[in-house]
Amino acid sequence: MAREFSLEKTRNIGIMAHVDAGKTTTTERILYYTGKIHKIGETHEGASQMDWMEQEQERGITITSAATTAQWNNHRVNIIDTPGHVDFTIEVQRSLRVLDGAVTVLDSQSGVEPQTETVWRQATEYGVPRIVFANKMDKIGADFLYSVSTLHDRLQANAHPIQLPIGSEDDFRGIIDLIKMKAEIYTNDLGTDILEEDIPAEYLDQAQEYREKLIEAVAETDEELMMKYLEGEEITNEELKAGIRKATINVEFFPVLCGSAFKNKGVQLMLDAVIDYLPSPLDIPAIKGINPDTDAEETRPASDEEPFAALAFKIMTDPFVGRLTFFRVYSGVLQSGSYVLNTSKGKRERIGRILQMHANSRQEIDTVYSGDIAAAVGLKDTTTGDSLTDEKSKIILESINVPEPVIQLMVEPKSKADQDKMGIALQKLAEEDPTFRVETNVETGETVISGMGELHLDVLVDRMRREFKVEANVGAPQVSYRETFRASTQARGFFKRQSGGKGQFGDVWIEFTPNEEGKGFEFENAIVGGVVPREFIPAVEKGLVESMANGVLAGYPMVDVKAKLYDGSYHDVDSSETAFKIAASLSLKEAAKSAQPAILEPMMLVTITVPEENLGDVMGHVTARRGRVDGMEAHGNSQIVRAYVPLAEMFGYATVLRSASQGRGTFMMVFDHYEDVPKSVQEEIIKKNKGED
């Protein structure tokens, strides 16, 4: 089948926002106006098309990023709906990795909220161009210009309105287009009848002021436009649109639009802006990767003529077709029934069927082209972040960063029948979600699951019950602590055993130094002259990795340590891999005496919104929880407090805040970084883990 839409007419976009900003409703309206659905589903009624898991429909939030293909103005728009809840950060990250552009949805009463900041930061990291849609203009307290100001103040974004609202709250009835300088008035509830009129007289001065600001902001990103602007020449609408497009694609400018998805206003104009200002696959730089055979950097431009290269960004278990692998094609063409190479794993995979998804319904297709997003059935070894390529033209694309889980709990099956099913269920859920880890406690044999927050683990335990019919008892949430070294040291590990026949002999000297935060464990072999034979070097590294999994203070995994093997000795007969593994672990234990081992705890960025009169209480809460206030700002009659607080101190805080503020206070928290626990707390943790009172 020939390509239906050219690359210029393809858009891969994400819809991202803070929880409850109306993101799923916005996506629903896009599907409605692009002809994908005939009846609109409301999130608060639990009927949304994109939220297709039972847990999502019950909770009214989006958990997994469903991928959908729609058409608008002779363009194909592939949409990824991403969750706004902080516990599902990985879903946002893996979506951003394969998108070309995004629509950031704001609640125009609140403007930029904590999770907006998180996803904005991630989008900036991945260099994703964005347009902003200030939603809920019909809501009480909606304030478009306040929302725009929060983009400047909280995100330092060069964001400017390309539209202004006509009216707000119940009186929101239309939009002023600052490029055409016309008013778009909505005359019916479905938003399908729009009258284009002259701008009402009472809005004309404001419209002219903001058009002038828009022209100036765009001119600052383009030398030619700047010259015209300074010389007082008129900038045409076409030049202005071209300038906005160029600056948006270069991530130098963010157009801001307004509307109410719930009231069907502004969505079509936002779709026009997606086409006008967000990039096609041809507008973004060619994807880079490494050739696994030569280690040389290579690129794959977006073209059907190039060799096939794609990135798997999500695994899902579908109740009807089984395991689905979502992938983004960067170059080349793929046909169902063909073979590809998973270069990340070095394994050959057969593409059974290719499906294009619409929320949770599917259409089977024979061929998928560069720039497209699709799902494959039948891939056995592929996981999130793997590269799939032509067997003759190998390339490994940059993978997806997976954040460390911060919270864990114990799960135990209720019956013997549940025990066997639980292992399979947890394995499948971990395949789908890289931030979900399953471990067995070596000493107790208990199964411990870890994730990004309480809601994250709640949803996974719930899915285990519903989808896999496993009943389990769940323990109280625990913090995922980490351990590290804070000082450099050198330590010897010497292991010798002689008990008749062949003995065991391993001897190593290792230098341990603290590594940069987030760099994990790095091993360096600095042996010269073969004092430790080459075949035993991997055993030394393995011995360290295995020992570090259970720490040196309280049994928590060690992170951010560099180990340099620089000396040692061996025995011609008695040395073995096992002996060197044990020697390495003894070296780590020895190092712990002088390397200032420390326990690290997850620090959360907590944003608390309370009425003015409760500000004192909140400051007290933060201090009592070993937190530190990072900033405050007033918003109407409320105060917004930002603070860094240890996760260990935040359990049960919702109840405390509710009673202190008579139910009017709210808070959001998102993992920010790991930090050393104070000495007194460290001693308590060590005692507790050693079973002392």
UniProtKB/Swiss-Prot annotation:
Descriptive protein name: Elongation factor G
Organism: Streptococcus pneumoniae (strain CGSP14)
Family statement: Belongs to the TRAFAC class translation factor GTPase superfamily. Classic translation factor GTPase family. EF-G/EF-2 subfamily.
UniProt-recorded Gene Ontology molecular function terms: GTP binding; GTPase activity; translation elongation factor activity
Residues covered by the tr-type G domain: 8-282
GO (cellular component) term, any one: cytoplasm
Main subcellular location: cytoplasm
Keywords on record: Cytoplasm, Elongation factor, GTP-binding, Nucleotide-binding, Protein biosynthesis
Cysteines engaged in disulfide bonds, as pairs: none
GO biological process, one term: ribosome disassembly
Function description: Catalyzes the GTP-dependent ribosomal translocation step during translation elongation. During this step, the ribosome changes from the pre-translocational (PRE) to the post-translocational (POST) state as the newly formed A-site-bound peptidyl-tRNA and P-site-bound deacylated tRNA move to the P and E sites, respectively. Catalyzes the coordinated movement of the two tRNA molecules, the mRNA and conformational changes in the ribosome.
Signal peptide range in chain numbering: none
Gene: fusA
